[in-house]
Swiss-Prot record:
The encoding gene: PRT1
The keyword Cell cycle is annotated on this UniProt entry: no
GO molecular function, one term: RNA binding
Function: RNA-binding component of the eukaryotic translation initiation factor 3 (eIF-3) complex, which is involved in protein synthesis of a specialized repertoire of mRNAs and, together with other initiation factors, stimulates binding of mRNA and methionyl-tRNAi to the 40S ribosome. The eIF-3 complex specifically targets and initiates translation of a subset of mRNAs involved in cell proliferation.
Assembly notes: Component of the eukaryotic translation initiation factor 3 (eIF-3) complex.
Protein name in UniProt: Eukaryotic translation initiation factor 3 subunit B
Family that this chain belongs to: Belongs to the eIF-3 subunit B family.
Main location: cytoplasm
UniProt record, GO biological process: formation of cytoplasmic translation initiation complex
Keyword Cytoplasm in record: yes
Length: 750
């Protein structure tokens, strides 16, 4: 039992013998000591203010507070505006925010903000002013800056000028620890451009227009390009995992699963405001960070949310087609749209959409009928909440106007699929029965360019759609369906591949979407359209039962079946191939070639690649140990006008004759070169053989041996069997026995 007060001795209560200094409370002091803020992290300096007198000063401060409070909390007492000896202000002010994060936000969002028509605010951190403006840092006398001589830089689009004048495309291969960039030579060995060891630590990635090659390292991201493949940009984001570019290569977002930790010594690019963040958005031109964000916890929504493992959303930040906006989903509550390049939240608030699950920007700037003002569109969907139906909506930015919405019922899941020109968006709706034991899919197709954005419903699909793909720059699409529920099973279920296209209509109108044809009992699970349209590959990816590739032409020039003459497609299976262990497929940007490969990242069996032409003919295959990645280099958009492109298509047959002749000449010259090389090698061998024979004759003569040993042996053997002169040759009798069958019969005895 613990001692009570009554059990204490008198000496235990004697305060005179008690010495406070003998008690060690350092651990308690360290744990509970209040940390007083030190330094000027919460202060900013605002320059560019108008010159006012003492009477005008309060009005200016109140007017300035409207700007300052847009990014944080500032009171009137937190603004100090020094006055000069002449009674007028010095045109700047010191402002104290409630936290360093608010001060950093003020610098980021208010710098270069116009106060009125004549004055523009310049906002800087007090710590920066102290660091760079400290005594001794600034010289008293002005020294003109040294202007370096102009040095011409390499053209970053030089890859568009193929030195062979054959219009070849480039690709990158990552195998083992080596990364190489090559010219595609069809059936021949690829022509190596550059090959480097340890070029990346995880993977490589092209920018959307092919200008940069991205390498990923523990210290951050590097961009490479130009004819010499020099390092062009550096983005220090520690332990970066993923990278995504804006469509026009103006910005980039990096993500790391580890929050950023800024050391006491500082960071070369990031600040304390970025500490604890996972995402960083960068300006590619300046290589500077625009803003950073922390990882979001995905909220649970719906009855089955707890049962389903949450998938990591990537890309978490999605770009508008013109790079003017980037948006982020706050699942279940809102969508935050930021204006670039300042990364200000549009209208200073997120767009509230109750229950929102996903959204997708239009991939091209839309041109809706009757709408002449600038806009970008994104499509979003919300699930059924209580008695409210699920909803799909099209929102215009920056007006935030809902231009079209659609209510849906009995919804299990929704996927959004934009067509490349933003002419359509297909909303793939997985619906469940009342018992929730079976599922079926309907396709809700929004015709975005038509007046009023009409919606066409394709509800003839009885099974669940597991894959959907629009034809690029076209209006046909392919789906893959399965009657069985999709899940982790030992044997993948059989699938069906269905083709859809519009029916013919008068003028330039697009008819209703009709079913073209279905191919049953397939193992396919992936669809890959040519970037130029018309040709499509349907394949079985990462399937242990099958590795088939089917090459289709939807504009076959042969005769159409009678029942399909009113449709805008003519389907033809051109070829079927197989690549065992195939994990990935990618078309080249010209739509002429298809690469398939088996990556060691997914398995280690028969790693390597196959190269096909658009018809499905195998051009080249190569097994490479530890083969990891293949990626075609993208091309920027063409500079030709539509009329120029139309004229080229019109004269394509004439160009084709020239190209075919050039190909034939190249093959012929290659054959001639091979024959000449072989003839040269044969001549060298014959010359060497003759010289060896001459040396051998000389050596035999020196040793007293016959010049031709074979002839000497024959002479000796002939002499041994030939009788000497005057001797009679003994007669020899040769008997020959011959057997002839006159008749043959067969008898069977029981």
């Amino acid at each position: 039992m613990a001692p009570s007060f009554d059990h204490l001795r008198d000496e235990d209560l004697d305060e005179e013998d008690f010495d406070m200094d003998e008690v060690d409370i350092s651990d308690l002091r360290e744990k509970y000591e209040v940390q007083l803020e030190q330094g000027y992290d919460t202060f900013v300096v605002v320059d560019g203010l108008p010159e006012v007198n003492a009477d005008q000063k309060p009005k200016l401060v109140k007017f300035l507070l409207k700007k300052l409070n847009s990014v944080g909390r500032v009171s009137e007492d937190s603004v100090y505006m020094p006055m000069g000896d002449n009674g007028l202000s010095l045109r700047f002010a010191f402002v104290e925010y409630s936290s360093p994060a608010e001060a950093a936000a003020a610098v980021r969002q208010l710098d270069f903000t116009p106060l009125d028509k004549k004055h523009t605010l310049r906002v800087n951190k007090m710590t920066d002013v102290d660091r760079y403006g400290r005594e001794g840092r600034i010289e008293e006398e002005y020294t003109a800056p040294k202007i370096e001589e102009f040095q011409e830089k390499e053209h970053l689009r030089s890859f568009m000028a193929d030195p062979s004048e054959r219009g070849r495309d480039q690709f990158v291969m990552f195998r083992g620890e080596t990364v190489g960039v090559f010219w595609n030579n069809e059936k021949d060995q690829p022509e190596n451009i550059v090959d480097r060891q340890q070029w990346t630590e995880t993977f490589v990635q092209w920018s959307p227009q092919g200008t940069y090659l991205t390498s990923v390292h523990a210290q951050g991201v590097l961009l490479w390009g130009g004819a010499s493949w020099a390092r062009l940009r550096r983005f220090p984001h520690p332990f970066v995992n993923l990278v995504a570019f804006s469509p026009n290569e103006k910005y980039m977002v990096t993500w790391s699963n580890r929050p950023i930790s800024i050391p006491d010594s500082g960071h070369p690019a990031l600040s304390l405001d970025d500490d604890g963040k996972n995402y960083v958005i960068w300006d590619l031109e300046t290589s500077k960070p625009l803003r950073s964000f922390a990882q979001q916890d995905t909220p649970a929504t719906g009855d089955d949310a707890a049962k389903k493992s949450a998938k990591f959303p990537w890309p978490a930040f999605k770009w508008s087609a013109d790079d003017k906006y980037v948006a982020r989903l706050n699942q279940g509550t809102s969508i935050s749209v930021y204006e670039l390049p300042k990364m200000n939240l549009m209208d200073k608030t997120a767009i509230k959409i109750e229950g929102v699950m996903d959204f997708e920007w239009a991939p091209a700037t839309p041109r809706r009928d009757g709408v002449k003002t600038y806009e970008q569109l994104f499509c979003f969907w919300t699930p059924e909440i209580g008695s409210n139906p699920a909803r799909v909506g099209l929102m215009s930015i920056p007006s935030k106007q809902i231009v079209r919405s659609l209510n849906l019922f009995s919804v299990s899941d929704v996927k959004l699929h934009w067509q490349s020109d933003s002419a359509y968006i297909c909303v793939k709706v997985d619906r469940h029965s009342k018992s929730k034991k079976s599922q079926a899919t309907t396709l809700e197709i929004f015709r975005v360019k038509e007046k009023g954005v009409p919606v066409e419903v394709v509800d003839t699909i009885k099974d669940t759609v597991i894959n959907f793909a629009w034809e690029p720059k076209g209006d046909r699409f392919v789906i893959i369906t399965t009657p069985e529920p999709v899940g982790a099973v030992a044997v993948a279920p059989k699938t069906s591949v269905a083709f859809f296209c519009p029916e013919k209509a008068k003028g330039n109108a697009i008819g209703n979407f009709k079913h073209l044809r279905t191919l049953d009992k397939k193992n396919s699970n992936a669809i890959y359209w040519s970037p130029k349209g018309r040709f499509v590959v349907v394949a079985a990816i990462a399937n242990t039962q099958s590795s088939d590739l089917d090459f289709f032409d939807v504009d076959f020039e042969g005769e159409k079946p009678e029942g399909e003459k009113d449709l805008t497609a003519n389907l033809q299976l051109m070829n079927t191939s197989e690549h065992y262990g195939m994990t990935d497929i990618e078309w080249d940007p010209s739509g002429r070639y298809v690469a398939t490969w088996a990556s060691s990242w997914k398995h280690v069996m028969e790693n390597g690649y196959h190269l096909y032409d658009f018809r499905g003919e195998l051009l080249r295959e190569e097994a490479i140990e530890k083969f990891k990645q293949w990626s075609w280099r993208p091309r920027p958009a063409t500079l030709l006008t539509k009329e120029e492109q139309k004229q080229i298509r019109k004269n394509l047959r004439e160009y084709s004759r020239v190209f075919e002749q050039e190909d034939a000449d190249r093959i012929s010259s290659a054959d001639v070169a091979v024959v000449e090389a072989r003839r040269r090698l044969l001549l060298e061998w014959v010359t060497w053989r003759e010289s060896m024979e001459e040396e051998l004759v000389e050596d035999r003569a020196a040793l007293g041996l016959p010049e031709d040993p074979v002839a000497e042996l024959l002479r000796q053997k002939t002499a041994a069997i030939t009788p000497a002169a005057g001797e009679e040759q003994e007669e020899q009798v040769v008997e020959e026995i011959m057997e002839e069958v006159l008749e043959e019969s067969e008898e069977i005895v029981n």
